[in-house]
Amino acid sequence: YNIKKISDKNEIDNIYSNFIKLSSQKNVFCSKEILNFFFNDLDLYTICKNDKIKSFVYLFKDKNNFAISEPFIYSGIVNHPKLNMKNSRYNNEVFKINELIIDEIFSTYKNININLPPNFFDARPFLWFNYGEDNKKKFLVTPCYTSIIDIQSREPIDVFNDIDDVKRRD
């Protein structure tokens, strides 16, 4: 994966059209209009694999260059759409990308405060950052929502078939 900091405002339309608008995590706060309007107050990053955007990071900065959540209700990370990937493969890739974002981008900020959207399901990369390390920076994760996966309406064989082949063998 490679990380690119967006410094040209003209890139926003392309990123929005080819990535953000396709993601289930899109919201009004990462619309091209908002990104263009607040461009000078934002740090924007793309995380790509083989020239294909896998995640987009948008952080609003205050006058002290701290990443803050206000005035946005949601901010932080927009992950790529699942498309035809199996759930387990998609979740694993998103987990790895989010770990990379935390290690390579978020850890460079002295102070960071973001509000991830309700369909950002896996907080483990935040919880595990510097886990067990005394006197090192950590994230304070405060969920403002819960999530339930309802598999009652599905046949057990369908749930089993959605599991990645490698995980099924385990």
Where are these regions (language model features)?
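A short acidic, glycine/proline-enriched capping/turn motif at secondary-structure boundaries
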Residues: 83-85, 119-122, 154
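Short, conserved acidic/polar surface loops in the N-terminal third of protein domains
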Residues: 68-71, 88, 123-128, 159-160
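Conserved donor-binding loop and adjoining core beta-sheet/short helix segment
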Residues: 35-100
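An N-terminal domain-cap segment
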Residues: 12-52
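Non-catalytic accessory segments adjacent to catalytic cores
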Residues: 93-143
